[in-house]
Amino acid sequence: MKDLIIVRGGGDIATGTIYKLVKSGFHVLILEIAHPSAIRRNVAFSEAVYEEKWQVEDMTCHLAHDIKEAEQIMKAGNPALMIDPNGEMIKQLHPIAVVDAILAKKNLGTTRDMAPITIALGPGFTAGEDVDVVIETMRGHRLGRIIKEGSAIPNTGIPGVIKGFGKERVIHSPAKGILRNICHITDMVSKGQLLAKIETPEGTIVDVAASMDGLLRGLIRDGY
């Protein structure tokens, strides 16, 4: 297929990239894992894995089960998504470019020989070695910068500060188990409010509470 770009990953930042590429006239195929764990699910095309299709603004991504179906979706002007964690479709379809938008903070297997142009978003890659170009994803003055030599700013592990709040904005699970959501994305919540429960392998229930007042921007899928 002409003007084909393959994007590895369909999370929120990947989705913004995909949206722009499709609007620019490219055919875009997204490769995802079988059970994506996007947090800002409402704006992540990876949700098509679970829902068969997912709309973000005026664009709808459709899950494809084979190459023929994917090509039909893309010819209609929509991004297609296939479950292909190892990138096997890259070898078969020979895209003009591969974009690693997994945002794993490390390279999970993307190489420069995958396509004439290879691009990676965020840290974990060296431009000129792992890929041709790295795009800075750290919020601030360098956000979106095109890096042709070197790497993006290393992951700090600390969320960006908004209105004086940083690490408080992200809540980590207090236990291993299955997530049972109580609140929903876009809910206004208060500090201490119950957001979800964790069902542990031992059969106990662990509460997950809000760490601050505010709007719930993201939440991993119920049952994950």
Specify the residue positions occupied by each region the protein language model found.
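Well-ordered secondary-structure scaffolds
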Residues: 1-224
